[in-house]
């Protein structure tokens, strides 16, 4: 299986990526991979923007949260509404 990665709004523009899939084996180190590890692998080392947010399987998550094979990770900037 793979980890699905999606980018939204300015993060999509900055990375030039809409979505991709990464083999879980490519990012798992010492048995644990985090959302931040997924960002690093997906963007080939681009710095993670300080205000970036993420969701794992459509639930808000911390960037240090563990990810598993088959998860969907979304990265997006902070948003506000009115």
Predicted regions and their residues:
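Ubiquitin-like/PB1-type beta-grasp interaction modules and other compact soluble beta-rich domains
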Residues: 1-81
